[in-house]
Amino acid sequence: AIIDYDAGNLKSVEKALKSLNQEVIVSRDSSEILQADKVILPGVGAFGDAMNNLDKFGLVDTIKEVTRKNTPFLGICLGLQLLFDKSDETPGAEGLGILKGEILRIPPKEGLKIPHMGWNSIEIKPQAKLFKDIPNQSYVYFVHSYYLKAQDEQIVAASTEYSTHIHASVESGNVFACQF
């Protein structure tokens, strides 16, 4: 199931999965999401607005339940950021708190534009399940102004450099997430 919370790249994620011959539902119905064998939280937008929408549609507890019951879960872009405690983008707004860490603004650096838009190579940790059979230093496409600083380095599956060290992907049990 792809979670529909009025924020995100739903159609591009749906199209990508269909091109891989996957059965796809796009839903904000908690019972449908809880019955799915895999769940994706996509995202493009602002942290605070996205959390408000998840709350408005009654999806906060649904997402927490999905991640607790061992269903494979993937957060993409803003979907990664929402899994954590808080974001500098919306001070005072609480994230889902499923994983520990914070979302920080990419610091300005001469010669680098923010938002970060473009291809960067990622340093893949050898134990990363999500990137099995993907070569280290592969290039992925980023569009973001905020980055993850995970509290526990053990959950970091891949990282990159852009003005600072960025935790680009994380894995914890059945929960996977990528900033790209």
Where are these regions (language model features)?
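N-terminal beta1-alpha1 ligand-phosphate binding loop
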Residues: A1-Q22, F180
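A glycine-centered loop/beta-turn motif at secondary-structure junctions
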Residues: Q151-D152, T160-F180
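Pocket-forming structural segment of enzyme catalytic cores
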Residues: K86-Y162
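Structural alpha-helical scaffold elements that stabilize or flank donor/cofactor-binding regions
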Residues: E32-I33, V66, S169
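Generic structural signal for residues in well-ordered beta-strands
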Residues: V24-V26, I103
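An anion/phosphate-binding loop that grips the pyrophosphate of nucleotide cofactors and donors
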Residues: A36
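Cysteine-nucleophile active-site neighborhood
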Residues: G45-G118
